Amino acid sequence: MKFTNGYWLNREEYDVNSPKETYDAQQNGKTITAFAPYTRIMSRGDQLNLGTTTITLTSPVENVIGVKLEHFDTNEHGPEFKINNLDPEVAIEVNDQVASLQSGDLKVTLPLRTDFEMKFTANGQLVTQSETKPQATIWNHDTKVNYMREQLSMGIDEKIYGLGERFTNFVKNGQVVDTWNQDGGTGSEQAYKNIPFYISSNGYGVFVDESQRVSFEIGSENVDRVQFSTEGQSLQYYVIYGPTPKEVLHRYTQLTGAIKLPPAWSFGLWLTTSFTTDYSEETVLKFIDGMQEHHIPLDVFHFDCFWQKGFEWCTLEWDKEQFPDPEGLLKKIHDRGIKVCVWLNPYIAQKSPLFKEAKDKGYLLTRENGDIWQWDLWQAGNGFVDFTNPAAVKWYQDKLKVLLDMGVDSFKTDFGERIPAEDVKFFDGSNPQQEHNYYTLQYNRAVYEVIQQEKGADEAVLFARSQRLVHNPIQYTGAATISRSTAQCVIQLRGGLSFLLSGFGFWSHDIGGFEDGPGTPTADLYKRWSQFGLLSSHSRYHGSDVYRVPWNFDDEAVENTRKYVNKLSLMPYIYTEAAHAAAAYGNPLMRPMFLEFGDDDNVYDNATQYMFGSKILVAPIFNDQGKAHFYLPSGKWTSILDGKVYQAPRTGEWVNEVFDELDLPVLVRQNSIIVRNEKAVDAAYDYTKDVDIHLYQIQDGNVSSKVVDEHGQDTAEIKVERANGRIVINTVGLTGDSTVYVHENNDTIKLSLVDGKAEVTL
């Protein structure tokens, strides 16, 4: 949101007041409260007839400094995010010249009785700063609305990322971003998952702790600053110092909540009915059995909207005309070793039998005059469940318990973005502008909690479309994806990478695209999209009016899917990375290149490839000629598919190569241990039994890798030492017969473990 007319002038409708100095400051325990008037105070008379901003400085997590800017001390109506306070040690100095607070390496300094500035430094180096004009309280005298604004400096060549699942350019510099959840598809500037957090290439991040709309101008109003503003009389934000991007994300998730580890089975293949297709018990079993007949392992089957009767979403009851015996059907699916997911949304159509019940009990949002808030968008006479009402939450959860007891394992929590923010009342009196974004958190939490209660914490998982802050185990995108264009794959990927830089660990999308058209997707596109989707953290075939089973395209599509579903063989590596990097440390499983190679300037703009965990590089091919253009940081890289070795020089290297239709670059970085089980037919199995240990281009020194079990607990460890051309392998915790494969240059040496040990001289 822009307030200025060029650099010199403010827009006519705005009155802008900025702190001109920090007049004084006080320490209260581990907090500093400073007072910043809107003019320099040269005499006692200057203290009259002017406003001040109260600046409160805190540190809830080491290397994180919280800043609250407050003009008027107004009542807060909520809702508000829950922020963790780990109560770190801080160093505070307050005297007649300066006020400063230091947490870990990060320090904020406010000089007193001189031109206003607020500097954030680490180890004596500037991180970012707010100066005399950027910070402001702004009054729109036309609309009678007040705003609070902050502007933090950007360095030369500094790049900004994150802000949720955004499908615009990966680097956000020059963009205007409003964090307001909307159902805008994946081809617009709107986003389902708006997260008011950005991460900088300069080793820090900023989280704006406001649930309502926050407007970001990333070098787009003042070109050397990131500006963020919101309605109201106060603004809370946190500066988070790394110095590495991984450490920034770790501290951010310490602040806002840890990433939860999804159950192992969720990492397998999900297949859906698609949306408006015809589906019945016969159709469902035909597709499930078809996957088995084509030797394609399937872990989850998803029923989309029409498991319920049309015009009645949601009834949370099966359409008995299509599914006369749902319990029997779920048992048949479970007997085939497959989990079940069903679709739901937080709305209740007027035709639904639940509508009157919810209306009579006061469980739906109302207008200011007491009428139910309804519209005809999506379902006729849609009402909205009021998740601020504890009784409504329990009522909704009780309906879901029936389904869980019946055999449903998971839910796809669709929608939750188009929540009214005008002429609406919430049960708990929440501010509608704040509730618009916060609603999806309450909706997802209600569903997630009931799964935890019924299935256990280790089995709880959601496929959630919209989001604000809470760390549900899976997020997905895909609505309104245009499947005709290979460019949509790139758009999906950069949206996913932006989202995964916003504090989330796992992500998926609709393989093949959701929106259909004549002749789409082509078999070529389907195969390339399948490779990308099956090498994502979570993998789901889904569409609108076309079934996404591979045999509907061609025989090669079946072969391609079968090949890349073999991601299951990598589950010892994948689940260990998920448990250690994501759940324990706050880093995503799929990650942009700069998270792993922060010292390489060539990777900071790259959003067409990614690291799958810390050791495997994936470069999807987004054209029908098989042309790959990918970047390799310095070192040796080995193809996990055919063993080809690439040697990238010290400065890194761009590679142009043509791959056949069933191949793409999937490369392991040097000095890596990858544990696999080629016999895997499910995602959840014993990751320590009868495994293959692949050692890729081991360098002199020591390297080790832990292996978790299917519950995410450390169970085994592999240690490797190389010296004088000799490699020694020691393992603890493995069972059965395991084999070691030493990949040395272009050769592969096979070894057997004896008493958990092996060695070879090269």
Curated annotation (Swiss-Prot):
Its EC number is 3.2.1.177. It is an enzyme of class 3 (hydrolase). Disruption phenotype: XylP-xylQ double mutant retains the ability to ferment xylose but is impaired in its ability to ferment isoprimeverose. CDD domains: GH31_N, GH31_xylosidase_YicI. Keywords: Carbohydrate metabolism, Cell membrane, Glycosidase, Hydrolase, Membrane. GO terms for molecular function: alpha-D-xyloside xylohydrolase; carbohydrate binding. InterPro entries: Alpha-glycosidase_related, Gal_mutarotase_sf_dom, Glyco_hydro_31_C, Glyco_hydro_31_N_dom, Glyco_hydro_31_TIM, Glyco_hydro_b, Glycoside_hydrolase_SF. GO terms for biological process: carbohydrate metabolic process. Its main location: membrane. GO terms for cellular component: cytoplasmic side of plasma membrane. It catalyses: Hydrolysis of terminal, non-reducing alpha-D-xylose residues with release of alpha-D-xylose. The active site is at 414 (nucleophile), 417. Induction: Expression is negatively regulated by XylR and is subject to CcpA-dependent catabolite repression. Involved in the metabolism of isoprimeverose. Hydrolyzes isoprimeverose into equimolar amounts of glucose and xylose. In vitro, can also use p-nitrophenyl-alpha-D-xylopyranoside (alpha-p-NPX). Belongs to the glycosyl hydrolase 31 family. This is Alpha-xylosidase XylQ.
